[in-house]
Regions:
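Short, compositionally biased low-complexity segments
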Residues: 12-28, 61-69, 95-101, 131
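Amphipathic alpha-helical blocks
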Residues: 38-62
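Short, conserved non-catalytic motifs in the polymerase core
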Residues: 29-37, 64-91, 105-117
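Carboxylate/His-rich catalytic cores and anion/metal-binding grooves
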Residues: 161
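Non-catalytic, polymerase-adjacent accessory regions of viral genome-replication enzymes
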Residues: 1-47
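Hydrophobic (often cysteine-bearing) scaffold residues that line and stabilize catalytic clefts
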Residues: 86-90, 122, 153-157, 166, ...
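Active-site-proximal segment of RNA-dependent polymerases
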Residues: 1-9, 15, 95-153
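Generic hydrophobic/packing signal
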Residues: 53, 72, 86, 97-102, ...
Length: 170
């Protein structure tokens, strides 16, 4: 696979890929009213997203903020979310289109938000490291970066993405 990937926008403009993005993006969100509305008429919304992409008239909405309680870490989190149509569908389309580019250079042990990897994958690695530890380590350091995504320089991120993706429309 080449180092840079192009023609992602054309890939996104395929109706089958749009339908796949709607189904994939709606997973675990069936309780949301806006998602149920889209799932009730998948073909109609597929055509609407297709028209937005073909005419290049998609304009992203401002994200809304909401506080949720995260049971796994036992703390409150402030999340930002966008409406499922059209923003959520287009976001999912972009991720599906760029996934091969990102996965190509990713370390095998990057587990977060990667299909087929996750908690079990990371746990298996940790158990293996502890079991085969030759030094006899006794301590573990668990760390978390506070508000990581807020600290990312967006201009630098876009510059880095431009080195991986050579599609100006994307």
């Amino acid at each position: 696979m080449p180092k840079r990937k192009g023609f992602l926008y054309e890939w996104m403009c395929d109706k089958e890929h749009i339908r796949e993005a709607i189904v994939f993006g709606a997973k675990d969100k069936h309780d949301r009213r806006d998602v149920r509305r889209v799932l009730a008429d998948v073909d109609g919304f597929t055509d609407r997203v297709y028209d937005l992409l073909q005419t290049q008239t998609f304009a992203p909405a401002q994200p809304k903020k909401r506080k949720i309680f995260d049971n796994s870490s036992r703390k409150w989190r402030e999340i930002e979310y966008v409406p499922f149509f059209p923003d959520g569908i287009v976001h999912t389309l972009m991720v599906l289109a760029a996934a091969p580019v990102f996965l190509r250079g990713m370390n095998y042990w990057c587990c977060a938000s990667v299909p087929g990897r996750g908690g079990k994958h990371a746990l298996r690695r940790c158990k293996r490291v502890i079991h085969h530890d030759k030094k006899g380590s006794r301590y573990v350091c668990k760390m978390d970066v506070h508000h990581f995504y807020h600290s990312v320089d967006r201009r630098k991120l876009i510059w880095m993405l431009a080195h991986k993706i050579k599609d100006k429309k994307y």
